[in-house]
């Protein structure tokens, strides 16, 4: 029986409890999950690619079938290189759906053999976004319910 490998891509700047929830759900459904941390230089991330990979690796270290890798370039090329059959995407709200639906359609046009699988996070994570977490932290707000203690500590150090 073949192993089902999927890729969960994102910038993860920083990785939030919502991201973590999606990864853990995917890890329960699929044999192998690759968390693909995008370089995303155009987004001017708070953390470097290596820092984001390190944070995600640390937070997900208890998941034996999860691997965290950085990548740059076209996602579908990375997915093929990994030998994955599908991309996992998180949907928080209807506003995410339109963009994700368009992206899934474009990916299917370019790579017909790839599937996109949508997962929704637990209710308490539905409205968490990395950009909102960064904004709250920059304004000295409490982000503890949105990120792990390790991420909160690293953000505090970045903003010091």
Swiss-Prot record:
Gene Ontology cellular component list: cytoplasm
This entry's Enzyme Commission designation comes to 2.7.7.3
Pfam families per the UniProt record, alphabetical: CTP_transf_like
One biological process GO term for this chain? coenzyme A biosynthetic process
A GO molecular function assigned to this protein is: ATP binding
Chief location = cytoplasm
Official protein name in the record? Phosphopantetheine adenylyltransferase
Q: Which gene encodes it?
A: coaD
């Amino acid at each position: 029986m073949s192993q089902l490998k999927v890729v969960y891509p994102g910038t993860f700047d920083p990785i939030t409890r919502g991201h973590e929830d999606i990864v853990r759900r995917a890890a329960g459904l699929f044999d192998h999950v690759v968390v693909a941390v995008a370089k995303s230089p155009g987004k001017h991330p708070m953390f470097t690619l290596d820092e984001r990979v390190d944070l995600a690796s640390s937070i997900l270290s208890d998941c034996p079938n999860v691997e965290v890798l950085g990548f740059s370039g076209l996602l579908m090329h990375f997915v093929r290189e990994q030998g994955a059959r599908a991309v996992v995407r998180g949907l928080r709200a209807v506003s995410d759906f339109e963009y994700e639906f368009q992206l899934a359609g474009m990916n299917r046009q370019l790579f017909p053999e790839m599937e996109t699988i949508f997962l929704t996070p637990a209710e308490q994570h539905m409205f968490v976004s990395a950009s909102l977490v960064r904004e709250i932290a920059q304004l000295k707000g409490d982000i503890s319910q949105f990120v792990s203690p390790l991420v909160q500590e690293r953000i505090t150090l970045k903003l010091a």
